[in-house]
Amino acid sequence: MKIQTAPLLLALTVMPLGAVFACDAPVAPPSPDGGSATLEEMIAAQGEVKAFQAANAEYLECVDNQMSAEQASIDEGDESAKERYALAAADYNAAVSREEQVAADFNSAIKAYKAANPD
């Protein structure tokens, strides 16, 4: 099977940068009910939070790279890159807020767990 490279190269050169940077935001894990969760459930939830934080760090790096590329396009006079940059910045800020919320929810679950299990 012979692959035709010319159409593929053309498609890649006219693709917007957002399509090149396929940054996939991770799904936030559910927060456990600390008041009724077992220790094992809390430990599992902690692992999910840590995995989410690691995946979110990769996502933020991807979006940051996208923003850098858009800034370079802006510097070269590409006016349409301003909108793409703003969208990427909004995505970045939303991801930071989402991670902060996941951490706050898990901290609340830990407090509830400790209150329900004072030993």
Regions found by a protein language model. Give the residues of each.
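Immediate post-signal-peptide N-terminus of mature secreted/exported proteins
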Residues: V20-S68
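Classic N-terminal secretory signal peptides
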Residues: K2-A22
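Short, structured coil/loop segments at alpha-helix boundaries
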Residues: Q4, L39-M42, I74-A81
